[in-house]
């Protein structure tokens, strides 16, 4: 309803991010322009993020015979974090009304791996919870506030 300039979500939806990129790199999925912006700002504040694709063919995994959308498909394990991102994208919305309305720019940061450091301290992170993405979100907020 508010039609924001962009939507950025930070979540731990599946363990797939940890499997794919380990505990130090956050996969970022969404609209290419916003994903690039998030990753660039993350690098500037010392957080490691990596763009991941959203292959269109994975969206069909969420098709359901009894609901508008399913959040998972029993037995389907390939591309778990990508399927989860497709699920989130389904709720993003558009900037206007009608079929030609532009989508709201959106990025999903899957912090399942990087939210907790089980290894040796690195950078500004000790062992344990890392607070990953906080500095990036602050940098993004500052970036959006500039004219």
Describe each region flagged by the PLM:
Residues 1-147:
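A generic structural signal for tightly packed, nonpolar segments enriched in small/aliphatic residues
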């Amino acid at each position: 309803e508010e039609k924001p300039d962009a939507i950025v979500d930070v979540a731990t939806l599946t363990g797939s991010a940890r499997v794919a990129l380990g505990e130090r790199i956050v996969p970022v999925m969404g609209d290419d322009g916003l994903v690039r912006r998030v990753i660039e700002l993350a690098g500037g504040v010392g957080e490691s993020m990596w763009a991941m694709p959203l292959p269109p063919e994975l969206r069909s995994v969420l098709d359901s015979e009894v609901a508008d959308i399913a959040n998972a498909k029993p037995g389907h394990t390939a591309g778990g974090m990508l399927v989860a991102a497709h699920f989130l994208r389904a709720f993003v919305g558009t900037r206007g009304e009608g079929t030609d309305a532009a989508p709201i720019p959106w990025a999903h940061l899957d912090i399942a791996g990087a939210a907790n450091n089980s290894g040796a301290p690195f950078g500004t992170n000790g062992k344990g919870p890392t607070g990953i993405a906080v500095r990036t979100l602050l940098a993004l907020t500052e970036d959006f506030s500039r004219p």
